[in-house]
Swiss-Prot record:
One Pfam family cited in the UniProt record for this chain: p450
Native source organism of the sequence: Aspergillus fumigatus (strain ATCC MYA-4609 / CBS 101355 / FGSC A1100 / Af293)
GO MF, one example: heme binding
Protein name in UniProt: Cytochrome P450 monooxygenase gliC
Keyword annotations of the record: Glycoprotein, Heme, Iron, Metal-binding, Monooxygenase, Oxidoreductase, Signal, Virulence
Protein purpose: Cytochrome P450 monooxygenase; part of the gene cluster that mediates the biosynthesis of gliotoxin, a member of the epipolythiodioxopiperazine (ETP) class of toxins characterized by a disulfide bridged cyclic dipeptide. The first step in gliotoxin biosynthesis is the condensation of serine and phenylalanine to form the cyclo-L-phenylalanyl-L-serine diketopiperazine (DKP) by the NRPS gliP.
Family to which this protein belongs: Belongs to the cytochrome P450 family.
A Gene Ontology BP annotation from the UniProt entry: small molecule biosynthetic process
Gene encoding the protein: gliC
Sites where the protein binds heme: C452
Enzyme Commission no: 1.-.-.-
Length: 512
């Protein structure tokens, strides 16, 4: 008997392993047929039906859209054309790839509805499903009222001085501490921007949300970051985490969720009480949000998830924007030199207010560098899904009411004929382009009235830290970086793994 089991068990295991691809294929075919029946795409007689991807078990194209989105977007566009439909889990998403299509669809975006749980399933909903950025209609207006003043352009301008100070402090302390130096190359440092610079925007936003942070609060927030990052990777991987039955299986995603939520709620409540005691101005956003929850205006989940969205959900987003800005300048010496001259000229004024206003302006070469990086390296390959309340025709194709639509950011920002030599880094292009045309031909904060709430603060953070780096260092790609555009493994936003060399400006002059 024992001998028989010794033979039988390995054979059964091998059979299951061999049968898995067949089982996945069968599931894919059956579910694809069901979804096409459930979500038909009508078309006029004599016109071509909209191209549709085949559903593949278990996430459709949902996981590929995040982890392999940039290459997938090009392949899908070449295969299916300028408008096509994919599956995010069991949810259909229509992809628009031209600015003309996007303008047509987003013309009435104030009436659009954000996709439930971002079309990413149950676990996503538990993490960010009711944050302000994913609410719609009256719920969106109700929660947005609690935070919009704190992120407005006038309020953002009040933070510029703090952001400049934090940038200088961060470079002086954190950059040097996390760099590689030697006695022979004193002052010359080697860093990986995506790892070294990530906590500057993170701590800057945390200070706006919670007020001046104590050393203990800083430690708590930065310690929570890896846990939150692992949790979101489980969200993107999908599978069982897409289903509301996931808690029954005690998956890794569920365990991480429970651990994070417990610590996050405790931190937010403690931070609220600490902020009330400090009574600082401007008033930290946590006070208004927590008091709105206590008054019953918003729920505790809406409060906690909106704070999470502003801080942790944007950690990889801001890190992506900052690190690619630095790397593109490291690759383009002429632009770097021009920017350094502009920054030094702005610093010549004795009044600190004038330098802060320089950071605020959107007509500088610094602002153009930030824009060009955002154009060339979109943070996400596709926008978040949303739907219109009525049927719409785009380029002859019918988009049925309440069908979610996403935008191929790479197609609009780079491959779009509007951008002459679109694959090349050229910040000066923005000085000769009409601002209205740029808005319609570049996907960054979204189209229409529902744009990213934090864009004004985000712009100032990027400009403050990039200006400070270029003022202090001549940067270049490190010789030991294997690939210039190598990416971190498992990064859902395409964080670069490239290292740079930073030579103090004075030392560079001496060498020359």
């Amino acid at each position: 008997m024992a001998f028989t089991l010794t033979i039988l068990v390995p054979c059964m295991v091998l059979a299951l392993v061999a049968a898995r691809p067949v089982l996945y294929w069968v599931l894919s075919v059956v579910i694809d047929a069901f979804l096409r029946w459930k979500y038909p795409l009508p078309h006029h007689a004599g016109s071509k039906p909209m191209p549709r991807a085949r559903y593949t078990w278990p996430n459709g194209q949902g996981t590929e859209k995040f982890f392999n989105g940039r290459s997938a977007a090009r392949q899908w566009r070449q295969r299916w054309g300028p408008i096509y439909q994919i599956w995010s889990g069991w949810c259909p998403e229509i992809v628009l790839t031209t600015p003309t299509h996007a303008v047509q669809f987003f013309r009435n975006s104030h009436r659009h509805t954000k996709a439930v749980n971002n079309d990413s399933g149950w676990l996503f909903g538990e993490v960010l499903g009711v944050c302000v950025g994913l609410l719609s209609g009256t719920d969106w207006k109700r929660v947005r009222q609690q935070v919009e003043d704190g992120f407005s352009r006038p309020t953002a301008a009040r933070y510029t001085g703090d952001l400049v100070f934090l940038a200088r402090e961060y470079l002086q302390n954190t950059l040097l501490a996390s760099s590689e130096q030697s006695l022979e190359n004193k002052g010359i440092i080697h860093v990986e921007p995506a790892k070294t610079l990530q906590f500057y925007p993170f701590l800057s936003v945390a200070q706006i949300l919670f007020g001046r942070l104590s050393p203990m609060q800083r430690t708590q927030l930065t310690t929570l970051a890896p846990l939150r990052e692992e949790l979101f990777k489980e969200v993107i991987r999908g599978g069982i985490n897409r289903l509301s039955i996931a808690p029954w299986f005690k998956s890794r995603g569920v365990r991480l969720l429970n651990e994070f939520q417990t610590q996050w709620e405790q931190f937010v409540e403690d931070a609220y009480h600490a902020a009330v005691k400090r009574n600082q101005s401007p008033r930290p956003l946590v006070i208004g949000l927590w008091e709105a929850y206590q008054a019953g205006t918003i729920s505790k989940r809406e409060c906690l998830q909106t704070l999470d969205e502003s801080l942790y959900a944007n950690l990889d987003v801001t890190t992506h924007a900052l690190s690619w800005n630095v790397l593109l300048l490291a690759e383009n010496g002429e632009a770097q030199t021009e920017l350094r001259q502009e920054v030094l000229s702005a610093l010549q004024s004795e009044a600190s207010e004038s330098y802060e206003r320089y950071i605020d302006r959107d007509d500088t070469f610094l602002a153009a560098c930030i824009l060009e990086s955002a154009r060339l390296r979109p943070i996400l390959p596709f926008s978040n899904p949303e739907s219109a309340p009525e049927d719409l025709y785009v380029d002859g194709y019918l988009i049925p009411a309440n069908t979610n639509v996403i935008v191929d950011a790479q197609a609009i920002n780079i491959d779009n004929p509007y951008w002459v030599n679109g694959t090349q880094y050229n910040p000066r292009r923005f000085f000769s382009l009409n601002k209205s045309d740029v808005r319609h031909n570049m996907w960054r904060f979204g189209f229409g009235p529902r744009q990213c709430l934090g864009k004004h603060i985000g712009e100032r953070m990027l400009k403050a830290i990039v200006a400070e780096i270029i003022r202090q260092y001549v940067i270049s790609i490190s010789a030991d970086s294997a690939l210039k555009n190598d990416l971190q493994e498992d990064s859902w936003v395409g964080l670069p793994a490239t290292r740079i060399q930073c030579v103090p400006v004075g030392r560079e002059v001496e060498k020359n």
